[in-house]
Amino acid sequence: MQIFVSLTSWDGLSELTLFSDFSGFMDRFYVGIENYKEILTSKEFYQVIGNTLEFVILYIPLMLIVSMIVALILNSHVKGVGIFRVLYYIPVITSWVAGALIWKWVLSPEYGAINNILALFGIEGPSWLQSSKWAMPAIVLASVWKDMGYFGLMLMSGLQGINQEYYDAAAIDGAGKIKQFTRITLPLLTPTLFFVLIISLINSFQLFTQIMIMTPDGGPLGSTMVMVERIYKCGFRYYEMGTAAAYSWILFAILLLLTMVQMKLQNKWVNYDD
């Protein structure tokens, strides 16, 4: 498909994929908006949207909390932070293939490390990746592990941009660490948090590699089938290029809408004052 597109004058809005029923090597036929009607009236689409939103809702808050903790540790001067600064970025530079295989082993119900630790406390761990209830939370856990160093580094740069004089003045006024964090750190860090929120939202909708390795074929009962995996399967497994392209445009529209909403709402909570 990509070779075919590269040999055409394709502007992304032509009938080649957007309004075509194209199967790769056969003649294409104009079908209008039938691809979109088929998608929007199918049960699979709403399951895919639901799974994707479940990941987003679980992933983004947890990722922000963990990344903030990482950033605060990196920005501190406690003993041993030098070792942490070396180790925290290892998941980021580890390929998703290797990382997903590691997590597949860690989450194994027979010999996985997590269930073995739970067994020490008399808790019977679930079959993480074989359960429709726990498969998506397991994917979220692995994704946070992979991304916390990347977003933690961004937040650390934001922390280092805050003038130390604010903290000194607050300390003189008797403000404790918690009040300094809520009244100084968080408000002045909102521009960085806003950027991280947009990037992480787009990143979460592009969920693919860890899904394909940890829970192939959509996971148990299709519980981890997400948008990008559906696009891949429609295009390169079923050779329904028109349907795959329609899914891609729907994904683009969703991301564009969510980004516009975030840009519109930023004035209500993002503080750009120095």
Model regions and ranges:
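A structural signal for multi-pass alpha-helical bundles of membrane permease subunits
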Residues: 1-274
